[in-house]
Amino acid sequence: MSNANPFFSQSLAERDASVRGAILKELERQQSQVELIASENIVSRAVLDAQGSVLTNKYAEGYPGKRYYGGCEFADEVEALAIDRVKQIFNAGHANVQPHSGAQANGAVMLALAKPGDTVLGMSLDAGGHLTHGAKPALSGKWFNAVQYGVSRDTMLIDYDQVEELAQQHKPSLIIAGFSAYPRKLDFARFRAIADSVGAKLMVDMAHIAGVIAAGRHANPVEHAHVVTSTTHKTLRGPRGGFVLTNDEEIAKKINSAVFPGLQGGPLMHVIAGKAVAFGEALTDDFKTYIDRVLANAQALGDVLKAGGVDLVTGGTDNHLLLVDLRPKGLKGAQVEQALERSGITCNKNGIPFDAEKPTITSGIRLGTPAGTTRGFGAAEFREVGRLILEVFDALRTNPAGDHATEQRVRREIFALCERFPIY
């Protein structure tokens, strides 16, 4: 229409060139770099479309059928789809898909099942846990008496005997099983037995491995835990957000009240639409094939790195992530993160268990295969990426501030690799 309101017709490029320019530069970065950050992935065009939809306009405080605003008929439809699909994926009786993030999901569980001052037992951040599991800077470390378990110095594996001893000693009301940098499977049955022995509730934070569990390649924590939290991105390959699952109806009621009105107001309906799409994708056989490739690619990348002279914490991986110990190369995590980014490879510096370096320096990096696998990389491509990473490592040993020639050459090879597997 010739008299159309430009507010509704002008594109982002026409209305705000500065923001559009930044987005285009980020798109180019994602297209031309290899993403190895283990907590990142690449969503489908369908998820992008859902998250950029008119649902961003809709306030929908409450839950389907029980909203505090009118006009929620179709918001209800979208949220019901998300709930039904995620329940089907994980064989759960109840689901809340409104948490804006994994941290919000974890906070909701703590609000529902613990009181300020209660003891909470979780994995320490320096052993591979997450901030929200009782780290001192986080709310969970300030409002609760946070006791932390770790890993064995000999094996770098979770010390379940220590977990049990700490539980018996401190009698927590909530035990948390989950991680942000732990490459091995979790024994949910053992965690539940420990929780039952002291009358604690067990919360599993499956954020990193939700996709692996969805594909049936890891035990399902819903069968063991009182409550399960997760993000919707990472291996599940959805938009950034969270959700909570339980088979206990009374806990489900408490969780719903904790999410709204306890922690949040209106849900982000456009994000919930993206979640619904991603959950639908996770129910397909193609998704199971994808996860199998994620796991195989992690093995391929790890094999190359080990052969090249670095150590992998625990000696390898059972999932999508690798925790790389750089000490055999005499390198630091921050130094390597920066050099790899200059070379077209993004990862993050990460402490290793019993690390002597500061968190801003670290002795390790964390790598993951979900994003590269999404864009189509197979084992051959990840072996090539591993070879290029080792070249950057070895150049840093000679030139600790960075070897420009090596980094530029690697960057060209990475760019050529990415061009073979385009995104968007």
Curated annotation (Swiss-Prot):
<keyword id="KW-0963">Cytoplasm</keyword>
<dbReference type="InterPro" id="IPR015421">
    <property type="entry name" value="PyrdxlP-dep_Trfase_major"/>
</dbReference>
<dbReference type="InterPro" id="IPR015424">
    <property type="entry name" value="PyrdxlP-dep_Trfase"/>
</dbReference>
<dbReference type="InterPro" id="IPR015422">
    <property type="entry name" value="PyrdxlP-dep_Trfase_small"/>
</dbReference>
<comment type="pathway">
    <text>Amino-acid biosynthesis; glycine biosynthesis; glycine from L-serine: step 1/1.</text>
</comment>
<dbReference type="GO" id="GO:0019264">
    <property type="term" value="P:glycine biosynthetic process from serine"/>
</dbReference>
<keyword id="KW-0554">One-carbon metabolism</keyword>
<comment type="function">
    <text>Catalyzes the reversible interconversion of serine and glycine with tetrahydrofolate (THF) serving as the one-carbon carrier. This reaction serves as the major source of one-carbon groups required for the biosynthesis of purines, thymidylate, methionine, and other important biomolecules. Also exhibits THF-independent aldolase activity toward beta-hydroxyamino acids, producing glycine and aldehydes, via a retro-aldol mechanism.</text>
</comment>
<dbReference type="InterPro" id="IPR049943">
    <property type="entry name" value="Ser_HO-MeTrfase-like"/>
</dbReference>
<feature type="binding site">
    <location>
        <position position="250"/>
    </location>
    <ligand>
        <name>(6S)-5,6,7,8-tetrahydrofolate</name>
    </ligand>
</feature>
<dbReference type="GO" id="GO:0030170">
    <property type="term" value="F:pyridoxal phosphate binding"/>
</dbReference>
<feature type="binding site">
    <location>
        <begin position="129"/>
        <end position="131"/>
    </location>
    <ligand>
        <name>(6S)-5,6,7,8-tetrahydrofolate</name>
    </ligand>
</feature>
<keyword id="KW-0028">Amino-acid biosynthesis</keyword>
<comment type="subunit">
    <text>Homodimer.</text>
</comment>
<comment type="pathway">
    <text>One-carbon metabolism; tetrahydrofolate interconversion.</text>
</comment>
<keyword id="KW-0663">Pyridoxal phosphate</keyword>
<keyword id="KW-0808">Transferase</keyword>
<protein>
    <recommendedName>
        <fullName>Serine hydroxymethyltransferase 2</fullName>
        <ecNumber>2.1.2.1</ecNumber>
    </recommendedName>
</protein>
<feature type="site" description="Plays an important role in substrate specificity">
    <location>
        <position position="233"/>
    </location>
</feature>
<dbReference type="InterPro" id="IPR019798">
    <property type="entry name" value="Ser_HO-MeTrfase_PLP_BS"/>
</dbReference>
<dbReference type="InterPro" id="IPR039429">
    <property type="entry name" value="SHMT-like_dom"/>
</dbReference>
<dbReference type="InterPro" id="IPR001085">
    <property type="entry name" value="Ser_HO-MeTrfase"/>
</dbReference>
<dbReference type="GO" id="GO:0004372">
    <property type="term" value="F:glycine hydroxymethyltransferase activity"/>
</dbReference>
<comment type="similarity">
    <text>Belongs to the SHMT family.</text>
</comment>
<dbReference type="GO" id="GO:0035999">
    <property type="term" value="P:tetrahydrofolate interconversion"/>
</dbReference>
<feature type="binding site">
    <location>
        <position position="125"/>
    </location>
    <ligand>
        <name>(6S)-5,6,7,8-tetrahydrofolate</name>
    </ligand>
</feature>
<feature type="modified residue" description="N6-(pyridoxal phosphate)lysine">
    <location>
        <position position="234"/>
    </location>
</feature>
<dbReference type="Pfam" id="PF00464">
    <property type="entry name" value="SHMT"/>
</dbReference>
<dbReference type="GO" id="GO:0005829">
    <property type="term" value="C:cytosol"/>
</dbReference>
